[in-house]
Amino acid sequence: MNRIFLNIGILLSALAVTVSCGSDEAEQDVPVQPDKPDVEEKIQANVLTKAASAVVSTRVDVGMYMQHYVDGKMVDLYAAHNYVNNVRMKYAADGWKSAEPVYWYDESSLSDIYAYAPYQSEVEDCRNMAVGVPTDQTSTEQFAAADLLWGRNLALNPTTSQISVSLNHLFAKVNVKITPEADFAEGELKASDLKVFINNVRCEGKLDLQTGDVTLSGDPQTVCARNNGDLSFTVIVMPQTLGFVNLIRVEWGDVVYVLQRSIAFDSHRSYDLTVSINKKEATGLNIGISGWDIDDKDYGGVVE
């Protein structure tokens, strides 16, 4: 029996990441691993970066799982001990490399492949993975670590050709743009003097790697956004619907501006929030969607 290496390709963009990987599901006896075939072929991992804004492309690693079919039937992912279980893909100067060789189960069995990022070194249960966003996202590393990506490719035939799994953003991105009104002198309001926070969002949850479903847990918290310069700030939040709450807080020295708003943050959407402020208060808000997915709804409002 020839042993066929899995040829893995990762495509990273603002909308998706492509990876090939594999995994299994749930409460069944774990299949016996086959003997290693004689012929080995080195894994190839190719990366195409379609958008320079895809921070994940080089800053985080990808984890992958694979599960093979038994008697022609799909097998769910187990909590652990899948055929390919949380193999790490790491970016190097010459492309993505797996921490260990990855093979198809045999020359005929179909396989399902699952992938996620950022990589977690210890996953006790891939059907109930702890995920979340840091409450401090002021650094590029913290921001990249908050962007959870997931994807799968099912019922794959063994092949020496490259296969891909599209990884989608499971969380939402919020871009806040501060616009000073006429009572500010030109250049008076500087990004370095501002801090922006998203309030009342839950930051913890669980991921089912097989389905991509995320469930929230924990109490609402406040997240500090990354300062992009030019009076713009960005933060990653988990998908959730907020009632009428103190949504955005902007701090300019001793002056605090608060926006009260109800909003639904959906997976793989990027929300552009433009907040107008004068020296006394925030006077207005316009919200649109861009970047990952487009939502043309105008959420406009008044901030006090």
Predicted regions span which residues?
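Hydrophobic core
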Residues: S13-V17
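Sec-type signal peptide cleavage vicinity
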Residues: N2-N7, T18-E304
